[in-house]
């Protein structure tokens, strides 16, 4: 059993139902004065069990339930639009539908096989690369396209994954920081290389002008040096999924729902009463006023595993944890 903040459970309710995982949600309602009303427990059974006991609900409670579900669905839609979370936005290593195209050129575009980096050829004939292993794994997991990591070779065409796409791919803060550091190193090297070439040209101008074949040889060497400098490293910032796919090929994978039989998690809850039987808890920034107390009690239990959000998309991290416990 997994404990989690109530708002995280709410936002993930549809995916939890797909996995046939039970929900025990202690809900909270804020009055017009801003004070919290009495907490209301709410339980949702597995899909096959949810049919029992429905006849005893009053008409007013059914209306309340329906309006709440519509509100939750609307929240999910807004989140999906903003950061691309949901069942199709898993982190690296999640289970994927075996029938998804692996990048053989029939669906995702770009010939060749996935291991060869299908669809990653840049405008100048070189292949697009990324700056970190985490970004490469996230792209392969989400789009089925294998992409290489930059290995300090010139020339190179590098994809810089910008903020909105970082969220879409579920890149951690550490992964973002690693990309930033590598970009700084590249620009520093590029700047120092440009200064060195300028100094070399200055020394040549100050020296004696060569004659005959020597002059011809010197001109050719300078021309070759300028050509190498013009090739160098190209860095392309990418903000949207659409642009990324046009550069690397592939299509977004549709993840198969993971059932309760495939996950060790059978129940998720934000109730303090469930601390005694919980095996793990997931904590993240939350608006659930009861969660702080629940997490404090859970942290006192030596047999409960603790998991914390890394700062990425919380819903994606929560579902990823459930699928791998």
UniProtKB/Swiss-Prot annotation:
Protein name per Swiss-Prot or TrEMBL: Protein VP6-B
Record field: compositional bias (Gly residues): 106-123
Biased composition (Basic and acidic residues): 32-52, 61-79, 176-201, 210-226
Organism of provenance: Bluetongue virus 10 (isolate USA)
Database matches in InterPro entries: Orbi_VP6
Entry keywords, A to Z: Virion
Function: Surrounds and interacts with the genomic dsRNA. Possesses ss- and dsRNA-binding capacity. Its hydrophilic nature and capability to bind ss- and dsRNA suggest that it interacts with BTV genomic RNA.
Molecular-function GO term, any one: structural molecule activity
Annotated region (Disordered), positions in chain: 23-123, 176-229
Main subcellular localisation: virion
Higher taxonomy: Viruses, Riboviria, Orthornavirae, Duplornaviricota, Resentoviricetes
Family to which the UniProt record says this protein belongs: Belongs to the orbivirus VP6 family.
Keyword Cell wall biogenesis/degradation appears in the UniProt entry: no
Subcellular location field: Virion
Cellular component, GO annotation: viral capsid
């Amino acid at each position: 059993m997994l404990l989690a903040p109530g708002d995280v459970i709410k936002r993930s309710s549809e995916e939890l139902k797909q996995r046939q995982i039970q929900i025990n949600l202690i809900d909270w309602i804020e009055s017009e004065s801003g004070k919290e009303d009495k907490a209301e427990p709410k339980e949702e059974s597995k899909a096959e069990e949810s049919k029992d006991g429905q006849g005893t609900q009053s008409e007013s409670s059914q209306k309340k339930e329906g309006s709440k579900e519509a509100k939750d669905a609307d929240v999910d839609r807004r989140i999906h639009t903003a950061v691309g979370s949901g069942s199709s936005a898993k982190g690296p290593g999640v289970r994927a539908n075996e029938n998804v195209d692996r990048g053989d050129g029939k669906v995702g575009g770009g010939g060749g096989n996935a291991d060869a980096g299908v669809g990653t050829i840049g405008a100048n004939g070189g292949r697009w690369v990324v700056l970190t292993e985490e970004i490469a794994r996230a792209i392969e997991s989400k789009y089925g396209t294998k992409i290489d990591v930059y290995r300090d070779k010139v020339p190179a065409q590098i994809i810089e994954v910008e903020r909105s796409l970082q969220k879409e791919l579920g890149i951690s803060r550490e992964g973002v920081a690693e990309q930033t550091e590598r970009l700084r190193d590249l620009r520093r090297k590029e700047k120092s290389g440009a200064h060195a070439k300028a100094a070399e040209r200055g020394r040549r101008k100050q020296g004696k002008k060569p004659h005959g074949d020597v002059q011809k040889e010197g001109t050719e060497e300078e021309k070759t040096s300028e050509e190498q400098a013009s090739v160098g490293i190209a860095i392309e910032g990418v903000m949207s999924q659409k642009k990324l796919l046009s550069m690397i090929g592939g299509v977004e994978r549709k993840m198969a729902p993971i059932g309760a039989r495939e996950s060790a998690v059978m129940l998720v809850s934000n109730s303090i009463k469930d601390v005694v039987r919980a095996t793990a808890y997931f904590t993240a920034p939350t608006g659930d006023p009861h969660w702080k107390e629940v997490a404090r009690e859970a942290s006192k239990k030596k047999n409960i595993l603790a998991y914390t959000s890394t700062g990425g998309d919380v819903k994606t991290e929560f579902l990823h944890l459930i699928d791998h416990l």
